[in-house]
């Protein structure tokens, strides 16, 4: 193969570029455009975390931009519209299809409705003009309803200074109404407003878990205009299951059974659980209280006795398969330091006791019917067959493939973005605040380097789905449960103890020291520096651990350098957090933390008017308004400008 020098490579690159910019005028226009964009204010970033499958609450926060939509409406119309009119307009932007139907029922004749159409279209045009004031026209065009771009642009940029086009603009709107296009135009404009108030979305982990509709969240994210994802521990569990880890798959199914969410697997992703049910009904009883499914907060009707019986049996069957599958992984990976989790080998089956962490406990609610005392890791032939079938079904589910591929494409373990560090779980540290080391494949890693190696293995496992017991696949499971995992953030996962030991002291899962050290501003500054970020300007934006505001815990820690935005989207946590989640807004003026109250139903918003569910707290205000030049995107644009200027000097200037 011929070696190409750097000089030759540069020439070839400039040759290719010159085909696109084949005149100095074209090149100059592009440079002028990019240089000008750098001077625009940075767009609004929206941070959400720990969605846990709660689609209804998540999509409401997405539709209202964490209160940003209402704030923009108030800015323009608070002195022009009544409270009811403000509420109706806000609800229309949030849920345009539903609100339109309700509003249309209020009118007695078409004349009144047409007047409302004209007024509402004008209000939405004003709102779009205001929300898009820091965007280029080309960026705004991409946010407009595609089929009505011409009409909307004419209305946005109308200039009637000399009254020459008055009837032209009136005819535009009247024809939209006459041709029965007003509803579709209003719906399109409402979604344009939603899109314009948020430039970019950051999902700081855990789309999946116990909530009922993570698949709908994934579909929403796939269609979102601009976003990134920092994987959470539950997300990686699903990735691991799809990538070939049977122990991840067993964990995932156990959690779904525990929280009565098996319909995610069966109905949403089309996985046949009949073989697992057949196995469960053969070996397990329906009256084991430790394995009865938890009541779902979103389900009003109770499970039938038959449904509860089936789930209880499945729950036991998959839990025992999980504990068996963990044994060979732990034994072939001594560097995981997980010998204490060889739980089935630590059980005394004669006395019905277990000794873990040098303490012996009596066991309750046991279901060891399928365990071979002499070889607890051994799966029954039926268990092996069931897991093989389930893994094949997972890997052949088209919808799951699409969702997991999107998670990989848009996701990462952490993200440095615009001077901040976004990470779901933690950076593993010891009590002294030193980065903890972990050995992988004979080499020791810590800090950012450790997270990079973890991510490499997640991607490798995903690319090599046919390998089910290689190092990369085992490391995906380790990220779910290991003590040096940046996603788990605890010393051990006590799943077995929670099922079978009454003494709650044995259930305790000790957190990584990171979680108390993150209160210390110097520690946070050190972590930012270790990840190559400016500790004077940067912050760590964290999820994973619910903030117990009800007990006085503050999500703003370390003098504002650490922001924790898991406040409890998951209904299961809301009684302990006291709220229904935090989100974060970061625009060119600074940062605002938004605390959300529990979202009950959109019907109340539609019928009774807007009940604002958020309380904003200023985290900081920028001394100087931040421009695109100061962002990651700005650095990318500057790099493009530098190359284009190089081409200009090389080809067109003396």
Swiss-Prot record:
Annotated stretches, region: Disordered: 288-307
Pfam (any one): FBPase_2
Pathway the protein takes part in: Carbohydrate biosynthesis; gluconeogenesis
InterPro entries: FBPtase_class3, Metallo-depent_PP-like
Cofactor: Mn(2+)
Enzyme Commission number(s): 3.1.3.11
Cited Gene3D superfamilies: 3.60.21.10
GO molecular function: fructose 1,6-bisphosphate 1-phosphatase activity
Record's keyword annotation contains Manganese: yes
Bias (Basic and acidic residues): 298-307
Catalytic activity: beta-D-fructose 1,6-bisphosphate + H2O = beta-D-fructose 6-phosphate + phosphate
Any one GO biological process: gluconeogenesis
Keywords: Carbohydrate metabolism, Hydrolase, Manganese
Family: Belongs to the FBPase class 3 family.
Name the record gives this protein: Fructose-1,6-bisphosphatase class 3
Species of the source: Staphylococcus aureus (strain bovine RF122 / ET3-1)
């Amino acid at each position: 193969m011929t070696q190409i020098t750097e000089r030759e490579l540069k020439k070839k690159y400039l040759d290719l570029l010159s085909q696109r910019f084949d005149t100095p005028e074209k090149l100059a226009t592009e440079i002028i455009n990019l240089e000008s964009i750098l001077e625009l204010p940075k767009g609004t970033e929206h941070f959400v975390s720990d969605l846990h499958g709660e689609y209804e609450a998540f999509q409401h926060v997405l539709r209202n931009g964490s209160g940003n939509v209402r704030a923009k409406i108030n800015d323009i119309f608070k002195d022009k519209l009544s409270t009811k009119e403000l509420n109706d307009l806000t609800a229309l932007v949030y849920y345009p299809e539903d609100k339109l139907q309700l509003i249309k029922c209020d009118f007695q004749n078409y004349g009144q409705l047409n007047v409302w159409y004209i007024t509402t279209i004008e209000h939405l045009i004003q709102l779009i003009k205001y929300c898009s004031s820091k965007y280029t026209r080309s960026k705004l065009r991409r946010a407009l309803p595609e089929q009505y771009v011409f009409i909307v642009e004419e209305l946005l940029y109308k200039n009637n200074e000399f009254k020459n086009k008055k009837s032209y603009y009136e005819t535009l709107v009247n024809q939209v109404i006459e041709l029965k296009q007003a509803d579709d135009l209003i719906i399109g404009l409402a979604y344009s407003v939603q899109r314009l108030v948020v430039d970019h979305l950051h999902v700081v982990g855990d789309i999946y878990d116990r909530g009922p509709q993570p698949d709908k969240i994934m579909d929403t994210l796939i269609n979102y205009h601009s976003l990134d994802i920092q994987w959470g521990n539950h997300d990686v569990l699903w990735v691991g299951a799809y990538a070939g880890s049977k122990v991840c798959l067993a964990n995932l199914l156990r959690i779904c059974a525990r929280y009565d969410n098996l319909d995610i697997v069966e109905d949403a992703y089309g996985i046949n659980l009949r073989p697992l049910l057949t196995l469960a009904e053969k070996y397990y009883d329906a009256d084991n209280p430790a394995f009865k499914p938890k009541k779902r907060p979103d389900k009003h009707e109770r499970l039938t006795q038959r449904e509860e019986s089936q789930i209880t049996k499945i729950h036991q069957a998959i839990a025992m398969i999980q504990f068996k599958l963990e044994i060979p992984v732990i034994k072939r990976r001594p560097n995981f330091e997980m010998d204490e989790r060889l739980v089935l080998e630590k059980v005394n089956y004669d006395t019905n006791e277990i000794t873990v962490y040098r303490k012996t406990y009596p066991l309750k609610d046991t279901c060891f019917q399928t365990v071979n005392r002499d070889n607890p890791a051994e799966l029954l032939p039926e268990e092996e067959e069931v897991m093989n079938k389930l893994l094949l079904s997972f890997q052949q589910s088209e919808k799951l493939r699409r969702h997991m591929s999107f998670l990989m494409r848009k996701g990462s373990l952490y993200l440095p973005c615009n001077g901040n560090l976004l990470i779901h779980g933690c950076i593993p540290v010891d009590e002294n605040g030193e980065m903890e080391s972990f050995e992988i494949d004979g080499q020791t890693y810590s800090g950012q380097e450790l997270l990079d190696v973890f991510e490499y293995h997640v991607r490798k496992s995903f690319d090599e789905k046919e390998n089910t017991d290689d190092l990369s696949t085992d490391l995906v499971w380790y990220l779910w449960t290991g003590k040096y995992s940046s996603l788990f953030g605890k010393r051990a996962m006590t799943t077995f103890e929670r099922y079978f030991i009454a003494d709650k002291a044995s259930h305790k899962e000790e957190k990584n020291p990171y979680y108390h050290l993150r209160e210390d501003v110097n520690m946070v500054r050190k972590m930012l520096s270790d990840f190559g970020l400016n500790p004077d300007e940067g912050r760590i934006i964290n999820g994973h651990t619910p903030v117990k505001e009800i007990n006085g815990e503050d999500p703003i820690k370390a003098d504002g350098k650490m922001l924790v935005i898991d406040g409890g989207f998951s209904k299961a946590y809301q009684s302990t957090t006291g709220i229904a989640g935090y989100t974060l807004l970061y625009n060119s003026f600074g940062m605002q933390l938004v605390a959300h109250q529990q979202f009950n139903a959109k019907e109340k918003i539609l019928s009774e008017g807007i009940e604002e569910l958020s309380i904003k707290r200023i985290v900081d205000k920028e001394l100087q308004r931040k421009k695109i030049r100061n962002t990651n995107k700005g650095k990318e644009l500057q790099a493009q400008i530098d190359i284009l200027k190089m081409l200009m000097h090389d080809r067109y200037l003396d």
